[in-house]
């Protein structure tokens, strides 16, 4: 029932955002009359033979399952067919090959998350030249001709994380941030976290710790930070690796810290559920998939009087013991 209501609201929002052209029905059309809403709604009834693909790298991980759930729900409600495929690792050439295979199927639209920001541009452009609608989600190809990019606003996510964690820590003291130094998404989260603290909690001192993109290195580096900073009161683990390594280092140290993770890997969700960490930040994975499908359908069927939004922030949610069960993959 919630998802049905969500779709109705999404449809209403789509109509208002895009000014769907089917509302301009001829006067003698059976759908004419009123404000044209009936005609516009009818345009959002698709054909089961129309196929829309989601393409990822590291296929099969929980993160993409949440994304595809959103796309699948939107596709089912619209009456079209949705399919998921992807490269099993982070090999760039491999994802290009998978995307080329999907294009060969001549789908109506493709939602793709890009393992590399530039390497898929030519392939995406080739799809567009064939009349296939393409949007990017989670990881962009900004130099390509993709129609829209749906992702987490990482700076805002960092601010939301600080707003949750800092009060748990009493509003002052040292908080460690464990993240991949140099990674654009993590750096933006740090920036947002720091900005919120500077504005709202000047008594917070931030200790930066590099997880180096490796679980072992992250655990070792966090352990060293705990030894060097005996007065740490909190820890924000800003990516999936940090979410595993950070709590491990804290547990091994025997110290009592308030801990906030990022993302909803099953391991992290289990830590929230058993009380090992306070909470985690869930990206809007379902929203990425849901709105990717809505955008693709809108463009592929010529329903928009306006260009799709170039960038869409799909939001984040704080996941605690109270709502953690909702985030396990189905």
Residue locations for each model-derived region?
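A residue-level marker of the well-folded mature domains of exported/periplasmic proteins
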Residues: 13, 20-330
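Bacterial N-terminal signal peptides that target proteins for export
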Residues: 1-8
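Bacterial N-terminal signal peptides
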Residues: 8-16
């Amino acid at each position: 029932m919630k998802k049905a209501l969500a779709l109705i609201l999404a449809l209403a929002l789509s109509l208002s955002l895009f000014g769907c052209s089917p509302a301009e029905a001829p006067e003698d059309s059976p759908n004419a009359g009123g404000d044209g809403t009936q005609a516009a709604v009818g345009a959002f009834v698709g054909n089961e033979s129309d196929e829309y693909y989601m393409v990822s790298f590291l296929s099969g991980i929980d993160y993409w399952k949440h994304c595809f759930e959103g796309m699948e729900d939107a596709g089912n409600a619209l009456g079209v067919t949705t399919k998921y495929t992807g490269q099993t690792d982070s090999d760039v050439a491999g994802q290009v090959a998978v995307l080329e295979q999907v294009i060969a199927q001549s789908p109506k639209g493709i939602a793709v998350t890009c393992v590399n920001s530039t390497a898929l541009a030519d392939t995406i452009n080739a799809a567009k030249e064939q009349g296939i609608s393409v949007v990017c989600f989670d990881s962009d190809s900004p130099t390509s001709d993709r129609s829209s990019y749906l992702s987490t606003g990482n700076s805002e996510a960092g601010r939301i994380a600080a707003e949750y964690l800092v009060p748990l820590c009493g509003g002052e003291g040292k908080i460690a941030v464990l993240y991949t130094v140099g990674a654009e998404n993590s750096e933006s989260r740090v920036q947002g976290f720091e900005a919120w603290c500077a504005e709202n909690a000047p008594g917070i001192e931030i200790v930066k710790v590099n997880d180096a993109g490796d679980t072992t290195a992250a655990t070792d580096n966090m352990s060293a930070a705990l030894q060097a900073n005996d007065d740490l009161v909190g820890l924000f683990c800003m990516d999936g690796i940090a979410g595993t390594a950070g709590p491990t280092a804290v547990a091994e140290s025997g110290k009592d810290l308030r801990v906030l993770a990022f993302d909803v890997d099953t391991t992290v969700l289990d830590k929230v559920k058993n009380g090992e960490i306070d909470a985690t930040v869930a990206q809007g994975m379902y929203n990425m998939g849901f709105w990717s499908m809505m955008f693709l359908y809108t463009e592929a069927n010529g329903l928009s009087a306006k260009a799709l939004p170039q960038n869409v922030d799909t939001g984040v949610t704080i996941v605690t013991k109270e709502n953690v069960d909702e985030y396990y993959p189905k």
